[in-house]
């Protein structure tokens, strides 16, 4: 009989735990060597990612996430729910915390009531990214993988690099990257959602944890939530002989998770009528996915896991797949990993491959399908762990035959001493570091590049930011509405503080602005993209009172220069404020999918300079009647604002206006049914004014008009529902455990 070497502290199966047995006494530290691997990986991340903690304005989407944390902290301090509050800063405002995955910002905002919110944001980014290998190890153990397999997966987890750059990889999160911070939060819960779902379809003893982590994943990041529910659909079919019972458990887990996440899902669906679809990115691979041909090309050429380097992770992913397929009949966890890898790979192909068939996926018209790459990455990490241990085990078997040998009659070699086991474990760790050298050296170079750029930005802030801050201090002291500092599609992209465009820098200072486009689901986000800076009528429509432009660049419309500091000049416009009086002389038909392009003619027209606008027939509903039948019969302006007090961050605006004839008082804020209006203290119905603004009709005369945002009002019952579901499952699990104890079953078996 041939002797077979095993990894120290491992099991007889490289990837699965054997039935529970009394553990042998091990005097060697080899038993803890897998945890040493995880610890070394975490320590490496903590060291490499230190620049994340530097306070600089962000170049990527982290700017909006940090701003949401500040906003959440402020609303929580004042006793309000962020979900029912008006987020005013981008896209002419929106109920951002309802339409977007806002739980990470709320949790960080809670921390931000104790410490500085920006500090809370930076530390959350740093710790969630550096400590992520821990949750990968935990996930592997939930699937029943051996300690070494789970630790190997954890060691691989920080080192993925793909062409899209928005999967589970460093580039997705850091300063020179994309800043998909909410995805990072859900990257902690998705592995646990998969692991506990794998267990729950075998035994409901893990159901409460599966429900909790599936629901949390959906609340933290919508696209990741789809991947969490994908496991609920896939895992019942892993064991055909027990299919119906597994399906029943999966239905229970899925239904309970939907109920537990209803506080996010129900408001989102109920108010989706008022959330814009991104017309600019619609139909592109960013929304539709890159398609089977492109994804498979990246996969087989190494660019899905190892872009720009030797495909070391890709190799181990394919080895892991081969091992799992070879052991398909006995290795249930391997079936699970290969199955979820294949399903998420198919999901990543998107509408580019499947076309209208993708409509079967609920809500798919509002998600960016390319983000499903996360599922391919997570399952690939676990498969790479399987592949690494298989290769290591094969190498150890060869070494044992060479160095320990075996007797001529096939008897096993002598037992390996504890000191030898420790030496083998140490060699395995060193070997892992060497094997992954192409990955960690590549990432180290990228981290160095990121660190250098963060340092350069910090240096530029000391001079350039100080100059711009002087102008912003004037803006705050003399409020006149929003600030415009260019667009990503014109001179604004190259008008910078260090490397950060000024329109992004304004966001870091919580300056209400126009120009940082396509950041929210506001109905005005697409019309903002088509803002015509050469049309004087667009400025009051968008509530712009100030222009910040490069020194030497004249104002595109008549304006008065206030001051210049360094390369930055501040101009004030002649018709400032958030509230204006318009005649409405016709109807614009638009939907949430075309409101931007439908508004192009209006935004380019001279009508706005004469304070003429249109009402909107939105999503097939009837428009409010215009205040005038024809613009030709009108003479002069319809009225003006006498006094304005705007506190949009609190959802409150008050104005005193004079109307020369029946007219519409328009608030330059994105339309939402949560807005309420009063005229002279009496409630009045709001009207939708083109492109998608909120207004109220008034008669001739002087009037006091108020606008207040109330928000979605059904959160409390939904919070209670989530709590009841989780408590009920927890109680049922507890009493089930008590019954098993009473029956003499004190320890549950591990899943296969």
What are the residue ranges of the model-derived segments?
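Membrane-embedded transmembrane-helix bundle of lipid-linked glycan/lipid transferases
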Residues: 2-455, 459, 470, 478, ...
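Extracytoplasmic
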Residues: 2-9, 14, 61, 75-79, ...
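Glycine-rich loops and low-complexity Gly/Arg-rich segments
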Residues: 110, 179, 283-284, 371, ...
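A short, structural micro-pattern
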Residues: 149, 178, 369, 541, ...
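Short acidic, gly/pro-rich beta-turn/loop elements at beta-sheet edges
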Residues: 150, 385, 493, 581, ...
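Beta-strand-rich ligand-recognition modules
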Residues: 671-674, 679-724
């Amino acid at each position: 009989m041939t002797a077979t070497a095993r990894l120290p502290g491992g099991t007889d199966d490289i990837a699965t735990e054997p039935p529970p047995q009394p553990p042998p006494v091990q005097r060697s530290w080899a038993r803890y060597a897998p945890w040493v691997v995880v610890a070394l990986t975490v320590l490496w991340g903590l060291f490499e990612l230190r620049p994340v903690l530097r306070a600089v304005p962000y170049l990527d989407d982290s700017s909006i996430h940090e701003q949401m944390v500040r906003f959440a902290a402020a609303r929580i301090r004042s006793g309000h729910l962020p979900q029912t509050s008006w987020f005013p800063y981008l896209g002419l405002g929106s109920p951002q915390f309802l339409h977007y995955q806002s739980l990470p910002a709320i949790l960080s905002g809670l921390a931000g009531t104790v410490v500085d919110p920006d500090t809370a944001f930076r530390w959350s980014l740093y710790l969630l990214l550096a400590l992520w290998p821990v949750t990968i190890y935990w996930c592997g153990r939930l699937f029943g993988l051996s300690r070494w397999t789970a630790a190997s997966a954890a060691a691989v987890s920080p080192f993925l690099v793909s062409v899209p750059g928005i999967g589970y990889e460093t580039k997705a999160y850091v300063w020179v990257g994309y800043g998909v911070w909410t995805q990072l939060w859900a990257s902690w819960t998705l592995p646990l959602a998969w692991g506990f779902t794998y267990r729950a379809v075998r035994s409901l003893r893990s159901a409460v944890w599966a429900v909790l982590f599936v629901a949390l994943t959906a609340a933290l990041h919508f696209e990741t939530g789809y991947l969490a529910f994908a496991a609920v659909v896939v895992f019942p079919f892993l064991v055909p002989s027990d299919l119906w019972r597994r399906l029943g458990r999966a239905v229970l887990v899925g239904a309970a998770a939907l109920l537990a996440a209803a506080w996010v899902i129900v408001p989102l669906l109920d108010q989706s009528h008022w959330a814009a679809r991104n017309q600019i990115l619609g139909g592109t691979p960013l929304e539709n996915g890159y398609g089977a041909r492109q994804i498979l090309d990246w996969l087989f050429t190494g660019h899905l896991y190892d872009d720009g380097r030797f495909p070391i992770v890709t190799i181990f992913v394919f080895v892991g797949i081969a091992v799992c397929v070879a052991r398909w009949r006995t290795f249930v966890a391997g079936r699970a990993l290969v199955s979820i890898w294949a399903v998420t790979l198919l999901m990543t192909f998107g509408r580019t491959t499947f076309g209208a068939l993708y409509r079967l996926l609920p809500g798919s018209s509002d998600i960016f399908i390319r983000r499903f790459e996360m599922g391919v990455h997570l399952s690939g990490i676990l498969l790479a762990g399987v592949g690494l241990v298989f290769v290591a085990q094969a190498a150890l078997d060869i070494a044992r035959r060479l160095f320990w040998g075996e007797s001529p009659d096939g008897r096993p070699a002598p037992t390996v001493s504890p000191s030898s086991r420790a030496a083998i474990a140490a060699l395995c760790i060193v070997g892992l570091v060497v094997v992954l050298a192409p990955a960690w050296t590549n990432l180290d170079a990228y981290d160095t590049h990121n660190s250098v750029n963060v340092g350069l930005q910090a240096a530029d802030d000391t001079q350039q930011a100080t100059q711009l801050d002087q102008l912003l201090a004037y803006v705050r002291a003399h409020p006149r509405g929003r600030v415009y500092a260019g667009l990503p599609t014109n001179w604004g992209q190259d008008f910078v503080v260090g490397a950060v465009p000024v329109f992004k820098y304004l966001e870091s200072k919580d300056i209400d602005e126009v120009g940082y486009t396509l950041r929210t689901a506001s109905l005005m986000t697409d019309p903002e993209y088509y803002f015509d800076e050469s049309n004087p009528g667009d400025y009051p429509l968008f509530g712009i009172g100030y222009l910040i432009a490069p020194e030497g660049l004249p104002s595109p419309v008549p304006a008065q220069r206030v001051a210049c500091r360094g390369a930055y000049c501040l101009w004030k416009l002649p018709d400032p404020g958030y509230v204006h009086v318009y005649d409405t002389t016709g109807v614009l038909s638009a939907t949430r999918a075309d409101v931007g392009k439908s508004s192009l003619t209006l935004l380019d027209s001279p009508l706005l300079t004469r304070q003429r606008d249109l009402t909107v027939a939105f999503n097939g509903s009837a428009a409010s009647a215009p205040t005038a039948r024809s613009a030709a019969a009108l003479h002069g302006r319809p009225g003006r604002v006498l006094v304005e007090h705007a506190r949009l961050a609190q959802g409150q605006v008050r104005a005193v206006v004079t109307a020369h004839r029946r007219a519409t008082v328009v608030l330059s804020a994105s339309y939402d049914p949560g807005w309420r209006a009063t005229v002279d203290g009496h409630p009045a119905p709001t009207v939708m004014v083109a492109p998608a603004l909120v207004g109220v009709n008034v008669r001739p005369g002087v009037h006091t008009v108020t606008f207040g945002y109330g928000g979605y009002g059904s959160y409390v019952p939904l919070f209670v529902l989530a709590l009841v579901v989780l408590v009920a499952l927890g109680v049922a699990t507890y009493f089930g455990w008590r019954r098993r104890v009473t029956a003499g079953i004190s320890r549950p078996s591990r899943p296969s």
